[in-house]
């Protein structure tokens, strides 16, 4: 297994090892399902990205990744959660199991803004309070502070005292803002609240208790606008080593979905080679680095195979 370092500080681990035979069969399609454990335990098709995650979780760091909607960001967050929780059995046969990762169990603080109420700034703040309180309760902790930013900090510090350096995973960090772009006053209020909230991660007491931070969303707001208090993020958005972290490569498409490609060819009464060309023409137009590493949109691919037909599935699924 080859390894080398890159300018962004990511250890570049070769992912040449192929998954075990249990991943080759024609499995169920996980349209809309973004929970790693469910995909693995209930025999859904899974495209293995764990070889790309292994160096990130091993060395730790603070990372930011922007990708379009329905591109696998939430599944990536769920996978990271399972890794840090030490769920080694779920990764049997996957690329990370062939690395020297030692599976330390770490406290995980995870926010999914798809699930957090953000109808108003007040409801967003209360929902964040509730989320933090729930995490503290599950860990058997009692938090003494009442202000949101201080409560977030106290949670991280106490979790670290209990179980070592913490992993923070924030999914859809920008959703509370994007959903209110038509109302500038409300969007600005959301942005200010979140700017202060995310700034918690930069404070000295908190930063020293962190192993890993991963923030992902659709947009890439300027540091001045949203991350002015959090300027130590390693931006993976256009980094070549993360170019295929979300989305399916050509090789992954043909490996994991080979039987679905055959079924599509049969349904369309075309050759397999023709179907591969059509899939490429319809869904292979995404590139997230200066390197020529193109990927397919997962949502479109899964819907195409599920319906055995071509359509603009991603475009018609919503905005942004």
Predicted stretch roles:
Residues 2, 11-320:
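Phosphate-binding site recognition
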Residues 6-8:
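Aromatic, loop-rich ligand-recognition surfaces of beta-strand-rich domains
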């Amino acid at each position: 297994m080859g390894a080398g370092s890159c300018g962004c500080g990511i250890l570049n681990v070769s992912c040449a090892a192929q998954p075990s035979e249990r991943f080759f069969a024609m499995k169920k399609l996980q349209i809309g399902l973004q929970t790693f454990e469910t995909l693995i335990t209930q025999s859904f098709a899974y495209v293995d990205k764990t070889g790309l995650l292994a160096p990130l979780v091993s060395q730790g760091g603070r990372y930011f990744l922007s990708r379009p909607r329905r591109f696998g960001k939430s599944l990536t967050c769920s996978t990271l959660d399972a890794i840090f929780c030490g769920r080694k059995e779920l990764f049997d046969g996957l690329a990370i199991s062939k690395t020297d990762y030692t599976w330390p169990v770490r406290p995980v603080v995870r926010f999914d803004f798809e699930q957090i109420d953000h109808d108003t700034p007040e409801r967003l703040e209360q929902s964040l309070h509730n989320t933090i309180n729930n995490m503290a309760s599950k860990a058997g902790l009692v938090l003494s502070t009442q202000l949101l930013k201080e409560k977030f900090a106290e949670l991280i510090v106490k979790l670290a005292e209990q179980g070592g350096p913490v992993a923070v995973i924030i999914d859809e960090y920008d959703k509370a803002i994007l959903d209110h772009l038509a109302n500038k006053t409300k969007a600005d209020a959301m942005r200010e609240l979140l700017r202060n909230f995310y700034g918690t991660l930069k404070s000295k007491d908190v930063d020293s208790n962190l192993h890993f931070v991963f923030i992902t969303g659709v947009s890439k707001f300027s540091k001045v606008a949203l991350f002015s208090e959090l300027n130590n993020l390693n931006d993976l958005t256009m980094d070549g080593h993360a170019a295929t972290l979300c989305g399916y490569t050509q090789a992954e498409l043909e490996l994991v979905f080979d039987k679905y490609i055959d079924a599509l060819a049969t349904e369309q009464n075309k050759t397999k080679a023709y179907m591969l060309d059509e899939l490429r023409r319809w869904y292979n137009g995404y590139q997230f680095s200066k390197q020529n590493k193109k990927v397919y949109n997962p949502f479109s691919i899964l819907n195409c195979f599920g319906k055995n037909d071509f359509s603009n599935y991603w475009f018609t699924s919503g905005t942004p």
